[in-house]
Structure formats: C-alpha cells, structure tokens
C-alpha cells in the first residue's frame, strides 16, 4: 500500500477527532466535517486514478455533490440555532422541545 | 231602520274623510289635528244614535253592501254586523279616542310630524272599527292585520331610538304568531262549513270544534298579550303616551278578547276550550300582576295592569260569561286610558321623567292629574259604585259561585289583591312624600286641551259604569244569592292588597339597603321570560349554524383531518419516544471513545 494513503488516512482521523472533540462552537465541528469530506475526496481520487478504475471516475464528483448538500444542511441548522440564541454555542442545544 | 243604517254608514265614512282628503293636501295644514279631533267627536255623537236605538228597541242590523267575489263556492262580501257588541263598543271607543286625540294635540305639540301622527291614529281607529263591525272572518282579518300594522308604525314612532324599533318588531312578531292560529281557524271554517260569515257558522251544528277554537285562542293570546306571547305589551311602552293610551289599553289589545266574545255561541258548548281559556287567563293575570309589583317605569306598571285586566277578561270568557267580559272591556277603556293620560301629563311636566323613583310630592303640584290618577286607581281596583265595580265585582262574584277550576279562581283572587298593591305603589311613589325630581322644571297642567280631555274621561270613569250597566239588556242572569263571605270576597281581597302595600311602602322609608332576593329578581325581570325566549333560541340556532358551517366543514374536514393531524401525531410521538437531553459533546465523546476502543480491541486481539 503506498504511503500516501497513510497520509490521507491520518488527515481523515485528525478531522474525525476534531469533529468529535470540540469546546463550544458548533461551527468548528461543521468545519471538521468538511475536512473529513475533503480527505475522503482526495483518497478516492488518488485510488481511482492510480488503479485506472475508469468506471469509477464519477465517484469523486458525486461525493462532492453530496458533501455540498450536507454542508448546506448543516449550515442551515447552524443558522436556525444562531437565530434563536444569537450564538452557536452547543450548550444551548440542551433543551429539546417539539 | 233607515236611521240606524245611515248613521252607521255616516260614522264610518266620516272617519275615513281626513285620510281620503290627503290628495287635497289638507294634511299639510297646521290645524289638521284639530280637524281630525272634531271629526272623531262628530263621529262619536252620530254613533250614539244607533246605540240608543239598539238599547231601547233591541234592533240589530246587518248591512251587506257589496259582493266582492265568489271563489267557487265561497262568497266574499263587505258586510257589517251591528249587534249588541259592536253597537255599544263603537261609541265607547270613539269617545275614548276623541279624548286621546285632544290630549295628544297637547302632548305632541312640539313634534314636527304631528299631522302624520294624527293620520296614523286615525288609520288605526278605522281598522279597529272594521274589526269590530265585521260580519265575516275575512273582514275581521283585514281589521286584525290593520291594527297590528298601525301598532307597529306607532310604537316605532320615534324610530331613531333603537329600543323603539326593537319593541315595534317584537309587537309584530308576537302578533304574527297569534295570526297563525287565526288563519288556522279560518281554514278550518272554510273546509268544514264552507263559509266565513258568522250567521252561517253559528247556524250549523258542528261536532268537534276544538281545532278552530284553539286557533282562535292562540290568536287572542297573541293579540291580547296572554302568557306565552306577552312580552310585547310592556315593550310597546316605547311609543308615545297617546299611543299607549289608545292602542295598548283600550282598543287594540281587547281585539283578541273581542274575537273570543264574538264566537261565544261556539264556545258555550265546548268545555275543553273553556277550561283552557280559564287557565290561560288565570296564569296571565297572576304573572303580569306579579311582574307589575316591582317595575320602576310608570308606563310599564300601567301596561302590566292592562295585561292583568286582559287576563281577567279571558278568565270571564272561560267561565262562559262573554257579556260580562264585554262589559269589562267597555268600562276598562275609560279608566285605563285616563290612567295613561295622567301618566303622560306627569311625564311631560317632569320633563320626560318616567321613573317613579324620581317622582314624588306631585299631590299639591298637579291637582287635576292627582285627582284623576286616584280616581282611576280606585276604579281599577273595583271601588264600589265607580266604573270598574260594575264589571269587575260581577266577574269575581260569578267566578266565586260557578262550578270552576279552584286553582284558577284562587289565582284570580290573588291577582286582584296584587292589583290593589301595585296601584297603591303608583300612588305612593308618584304623588306622596317629598319631591325627588329636579327642582328646576316648570310643572304646568294649565292647558285647556289637557284639562278637558282628562275631565271627560274622569266623568266617564265615575258614571259610565252605572250608565252602561243600567241600560243594557240583561243577557245572562247574574247570581243573586251567595254566602256573605263570597259576596265580600273581592272587596276584602282588594282592601287587603291596599293595606299591605301601604304598610310595605311606608316601611321602605326606614330600611337599610338590602340586596334583592330571588322573588324580587323574578318579578322585576318579568319572570325571566323575555330573556330566555328572546335570547336563548336565536343564540342556539346561530351557534349551531356557526359550528356546522365553519367549524365542522372548514376547520375539521378540510384542515384538521389530514394535515394538522399528521403533524400533531408526529410531534406527540417524537416527544414521547425521544429521551435525549441534547448533550451533544458527551455523545460525540462517547462515539470517539467507542471508535478508539474498537480500534484497539479489533487490532490487538491475537
């Protein structure tokens, strides 16, 4: 296995840890989510290009599309929380009410 | 014979002259009220000729003028029946109307539409005459509806006032309910006797007359404000005082009683309807007398007094004494119209004050009105040898000695004592004591129009009973012998009412303020009858229609069944099922620890 995969895999792990461990801002976990998506994109592109996996040439672009959608979703949730509370502190979300 | 018929025709035609001459614009003349008044006075004088002819020769006339149309087998004509009832009632009604018109020249003097007012009064009088002299049911119905319409127009005379419009509408609606009974009776007579003429109806022997007589009883209930259809009469006091004096005391409200009196040959043999009439009349007289005990508006007290006397007339019909009821109609017209005119004089002098709690001390200030009021009150309660005595005492005596319903008799006696009680109340609050009105008014009764009209009715209240009673032909034999206590019963009950009321009224001067108790509240709110009937039924129908139209169809079926119910259900179930508390960081941390643990466990297992 080429060493570059280890590098990209490490980037993914770093972003994952950053997603799961954060202090107060919801925005930082969303950014780490983007980081995860980015590393996945790079890994997928490198794999497809190195192995001449021609039929999977579309896969990175599709991944990007879905990443964009989920980023938009996450941002809209952040904006809704921020509209209600003024900040995006995650400790505000301790009150679930329907 | 010629004198009889020509006098009657001249009387009736003279009354229509001021109306027909509208095209010659006499009604824009300033002295049109005087013209109408003198017309009515001349009509009265001419109509006494047939009355005297009838009293001294017993001559009855039927004038059958004009054949209008024949509808298959029904012949409709214009015919006048001038028998005992109509020939005596016409002069009485015309006399009272003459006095009231003279009074209303004074009362409505500052009204710009006084000519219009007199035209309405005259039209009312004409339709009342049509009703009284009708020989067939169609003509009677024309007169019946005519007095109803004129009552509506006259009650709502001051139409800028919302209460007056409501009262006029109430009068029309309640009268309409009675008209249903009238039309039912007309239809029954058309189907079963093929005629609307009284002669033919009375000549045929019928088997079961319950339906038409019940219809006529319903019509009398509506027109004469018996219990169940009574609220319009106290509300009709929104009209001017001359209207109250003419329509709602002497003439229009007796139309229902007059109808029942006309049909006495049919009612003589029908015990069911007589019992129903008796109970209805007894109920009415007691209820309205109880309501009159606590009213504070002088016109409403007199209106309830009218209603109570009408109940007494209906009771008289119920014990099969139509001629006594008719006598009471004639005598009652005099003193009741006079009572209303006195109240009009008081109201006008006190600058339109109608509340008796704000009157007082008028004994020395308005001497003639005071005299007339006291004599009217005494005549109303049946003081021996005044007018009311000849009819009222006879009625009570006959009721006491006849084989009748004991409850009805008892209620009539109680109502008689209540009559004395509320009459004492009027006298006490209006005339006696210290004045409670504004000091800065001019109390003046010095107008010849007012004085002459009240004096005329005053003489009538004192002497008319004697004159009428001793000149009419005896129709039913009055009960001559009865135990002493029964003979004295009416007088004793009246004295009891007087004394009790006087005591109570005197002691109210020295009481502390007490909150009203339930019987008081019952009496002053008219037995809760108008409140329940006028508001409950419309509220129920309107709220039911609102619920059906907007809530059932729109809200429920279109809005709530699928869309809102789905969202509501989802929300409720998610609240029930979810038990999270929103500790996101903790959840993420546990996720990460799980990942690390799994990494270690799965990689270093060996």
Curated annotation (Swiss-Prot), chain A:
A matching Pfam family: Oxidored_q2
Lineage: superkingdom: Eukaryota
Alphabetically ordered keywords of this record: Electron transport, Membrane, Mitochondrion, Mitochondrion inner membrane, NAD, Respiratory chain, Translocase, Transmembrane, Transmembrane helix, Transport, Ubiquinone
Gene this chain is encoded by: MT-ND4L
Its job: Core subunit of the mitochondrial membrane respiratory chain NADH dehydrogenase (Complex I) which catalyzes electron transfer from NADH through the respiratory chain, using ubiquinone as an electron acceptor. Part of the enzyme membrane arm which is embedded in the lipid bilayer and involved in proton translocation.
Quaternary organization: Core subunit of respiratory chain NADH dehydrogenase (Complex I) which is composed of 45 different subunits.
Ranges annotated as spanning the membrane: 1-21, 29-49, 61-81
Gene Ontology CC terms, in alphabetical order: mitochondrial inner membrane; respiratory chain complex I
Membrane topology: Multi-pass membrane protein
PANTHER family to which the protein is assigned, alphabetical: NADH-UBIQUINONE OXIDOREDUCTASE CHAIN 4L, NADH-UBIQUINONE OXIDOREDUCTASE SUBUNIT ND4L
Full protein name: NADH-ubiquinone oxidoreductase chain 4L
Family membership: Belongs to the complex I subunit 4L family.
Cell location: Mitochondrion inner membrane
